[in-house]
A protein has these predicted regions:
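C-terminal output helix
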Residues: 97, 113-126
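Non-catalytic signal-transmission and effector/linker regions of two-component phosphorelay proteins
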Residues: 1-17, 30
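Receiver (REC) domain active-site loop signature in two-component systems and cognate sites
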Residues: 67
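Short amphipathic alpha-helix used as the core "switch/output" element in two-component signaling
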Residues: 73-85, 103
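Two-component/phosphorelay signaling modules centered on CheY-like receiver
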Residues: 5, 23-41
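Acidic catalytic/metal-coordinating carboxylates
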Residues: 44-45, 71-75
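Active-site residues of response regulator receiver
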Residues: 20, 63-64, 93
Length: 144
């Protein structure tokens, strides 16, 4: 578990990427995370994320499972194929089932959470995933 000083130091070094096609949820979650101290970038689709993200800042991805055009599973596979899987993925979905959870975790997802989720649990999982990302990044690529 992290204490408040460790969380604040971690938050200063990472970015949380949130990808969800539900714009109201996206705005609400982005605001919640920012209010708790995280730097957040939101994306309405996997394609928007792929075209905009540079993957150099450590952190993690909060990813919806079901989205039009490209699902969360397809994005996960795409990132693995392109060798851009350096950011831990936390699936956050209202459409989860055991098979989907097992599949995503076997393919490298950091965690699989159901919507709605407890904000304290979400913050803990984000901190753990971000710490993992930070510990695997070269020192010169960490955000200041």
């Amino acid at each position: 578990m992290f204490d408040s000083i460790e969380i604040a130091e971690l938050q200063a070094k990472v970015r949380i990427r949130v990808i969800d096609d539900d714009e109201d949820f996206l705005k609400s979650l982005g605001l919640l995370l920012e209010m708790t101290g995280w730097t957040v970038r939101t994306y309405k689709s996997a394609k928007e994320f792929l075209s905009d993200e540079n993957f150099s800042t450590p952190g993690c991805i909060l990813l919806d499972l079901r989205m039009p055009e490209m699902t969360g599973l397809e994005l996960q596979r795409n990132l693995i194929t392109q060798n851009k899987n350096n950011l831990p993925i936390i699936f956050l979905t209202g459409h989860g089932d055991v098979d989907s959870a097992v599949y995503t975790l076997k393919n490298g997802a950091f965690d699989f959470l159901q919507k709605p989720t407890n904000p304290l649990l979400l913050n803990k999982v984000i901190a753990e995933a971000s710490q993992k990302s930070l510990s695997t990044q070269p020192k010169n690529s960490q955000r200041k």
